């Protein structure tokens, strides 16, 4: 008996098709999904395979910057959706340390893919002189927040391959670590990044760092100096206080007004390297534009995310979804909360022509069409080919290792004013809980890496298993899951003011007691979320067993 008809189209601009599916096909599709999950659906694939749609392997992160006058409470915010299938899942708190004269600081390569904090498989690139003291920081795969409320997000844009140099010893994650250990403000971080890369060399791809301190937010881009050279080329633009900016794996900085150092900064060689490479002629008609000199604007997967973020922040601009360039930042038409930023990171182009679920429909016996229960914005390539769906690189990515959204607040003491809202795996299926920059430890399950094998004691797997189960029958299961994550987040947001009031009272009496109070709160909040998700995992198997 025929029970389902799919109405399929790749996009509104594509021809509509109809596909009749017999009842037994559901069984075959279920087997297909089980096999897919077993051989690679849980993440053992390249970033390009999972996230990329535009032919650029660097479509794997998104970062949003919020100025203090663009936020609802005066916070500055930065963020990073670490959309990678290889980066480590263990997270620790590295304490404040003092060092002796003559001490050296080891520099490692690719520390973001280690499996334990002291992984001996790390390749040591070299040593640099240590500073007298290094600041405490929350050590995510790309370290995110230090004890002075300096926060940083990241996206890779690659840059031109001729810029890569093997002469340097500092890669992107290590540069993150070094500036968070040594800087108190975004401007100081940029200065230190310049000094370190100038002296010891930068050896990684083109990267964007999105810095936030309690007063300012900065968009910083860096590339190598060219083969055989030691150094780096970089530029930075301050995001206006009432603006929101975005980076999505494409270079964004265009013209530099270096006579205005309050808003624009750059390396001393920013023009010279482009001239040497014949990428810019100062005597020509075209102005120098950093993104075209050292990168490109080809990736539609990047541009589409830029369009969507900025359109949600300033809808009255009516930005063209297919434009090559967008403003680096826009004035917020509504002041944003952390919850608002989270909602953007969960965006899958819903209610737009680029929503991948809108063309996968089923038709009942009565002839009524509706979205199919299996329609998902996170279908793999095989599913999209089968259902003739045009792939889009959405803001929300099923390959995420974690999403961080930081708050830095000038009116509170640093240990209370700085915090990161952190959630593992797909933002669409995961709750995000707070971790203050003054805490002393992470939950035990957050310090267990989950990349090499399934481990019940790894927090990452609690959220990963739920997000992967949801792909079987996305429409109903995602709603079930949303009820759980929204309850956890709503409680965290509702309790925030009270928790911080108690912490502030303790801080005035004894800062150490305030730190332990916040540590206990953050650890319990996270552990409760992990426990809730293991229960949800078990409940989903029972509730949807007929469909597996």
Residue ranges of model-derived segments:
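A contiguous strand-loop segment
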Residues: 48-172, 192-339
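Histidine-centered catalytic/metal-binding microenvironments
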Residues: 485-548
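Bacterial N-terminal signal peptides that target proteins for export
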Residues: 19-28
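Glycine-rich, aromatic-lined ligand/substrate-binding cores of catalytic
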Residues: 275-416
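Substrate-recognition/cap regions that form aromatic- and gly/pro-loop-enriched pockets
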Residues: 371-500
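Short, Lys/Arg-enriched N-terminal segments with co-localized hydrophobic residues
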Residues: 3-20
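Bacterial Sec-dependent signal peptides at the C-terminal "C-region" and cleavage site
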Residues: 34-49
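Short, well-ordered beta-strand elements within core beta-sheets of diverse protein domains
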Residues: 176-182
């Amino acid at each position: 008996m025929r029970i389902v008809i799919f109405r399929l189209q790749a996009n509104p601009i594509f021809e509509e098709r109809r596909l009749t599916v017999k009842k037994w096909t559901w069984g075959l599709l279920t087997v297909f999904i089980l096999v897919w999950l077993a051989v690679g659906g849980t993440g053992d694939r390249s970033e390009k395979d999972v996230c990329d749609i535009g032919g650029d392997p660097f479509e794997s992160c998104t970062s949003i910057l919020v100025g203090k006058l663009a936020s609802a409470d005066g916070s500055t915010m930065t963020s990073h959706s670490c959309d990678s299938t290889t980066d480590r899942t263990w997270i620790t708190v590295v304490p404040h340390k003092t060092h002796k004269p003559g001490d050296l600081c080891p520099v490692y390569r690719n520390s973001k893919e280690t499996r334990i904090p002291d992984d001996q498989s790390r390749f040591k690139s070299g040593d640099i002189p240590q500073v007298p003291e290094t600041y405490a920081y929350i050590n995510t795969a790309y370290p995110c927040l230090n004890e002075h409320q300096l926060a940083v997000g990241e996206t890779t844009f690659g840059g031109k391959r001729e810029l890569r140099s093997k002469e340097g010893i500092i890669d992107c994650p290590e540069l993150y670590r070094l500036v968070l250990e040594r800087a108190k403000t975004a401007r100081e971080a940029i200065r230190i990044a310049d000094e370190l890369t100038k002296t010891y060399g930068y050896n990684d791809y083109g990267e964007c760092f999105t810095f936030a301190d309690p007063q300012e937010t900065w968009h910083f881009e860096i590339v190598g100096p060219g083969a055989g050279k030691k150094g780096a080329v970089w530029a930075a633009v301050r995001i206006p206080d009432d603006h929101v900016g975005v980076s999505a794996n494409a270079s964004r900085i265009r013209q530099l007004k270096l006579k205005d150092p309050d808003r624009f900064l750059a390396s001393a060689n920013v023009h010279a390297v482009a001239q040497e490479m014949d990428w810019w002629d100062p005597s020509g008609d075209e102005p120098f534009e950093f993104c075209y000199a050292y990168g490109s604007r080809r990736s539609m997967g990047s541009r589409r995310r830029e369009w969507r973020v900025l359109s949600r922040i300033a809808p009255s601009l009516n930005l063209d979804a297919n434009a090559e360039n967008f403003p680096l930042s826009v004035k917020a038409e509504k002041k944003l909360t952390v919850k608002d930023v989270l909602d953007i990171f969960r965006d899958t182009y819903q209610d737009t022509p680029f929503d991948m679920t809108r063309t996968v429909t089923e038709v009942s016996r009565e002839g009524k069409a509706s979205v199919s229960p299996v329609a998902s914005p996170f279908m793999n390539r095989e599913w999209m080919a089968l259902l003739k769906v045009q792939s889009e690189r959405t803001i929300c990515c099923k390959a995420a290792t974690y999403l961080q959204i930081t708050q830095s607040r000038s009116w509170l003491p640093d240990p209370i004013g700085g915090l990161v809202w952190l959630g593992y795996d797909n933002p669409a299926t995961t709750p995000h809980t707070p971790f203050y920059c003054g805490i002393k430890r992470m939950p035990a399950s957050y310090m267990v890496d989950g990349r090499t094998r399934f481990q019940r004691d790894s927090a990452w797997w609690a959220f990963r298993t739920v997000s992967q189960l949801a792909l079987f029958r996305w429409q109903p299961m995602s709603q079930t899951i949303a009820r759980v994550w929204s309850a956890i987040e709503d409680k965290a947001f509702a309790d925030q003011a009270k928790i911080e009031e108690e912490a502030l009272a303790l801080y005035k009496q004894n800062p150490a007691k305030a730190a332990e109070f916040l540590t206990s709160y953050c650890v319990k909040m996270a552990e409760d979320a992990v426990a809730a998700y293991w229960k949800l995992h078990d409940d989903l198997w029972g509730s949807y067993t007929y469909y597996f």
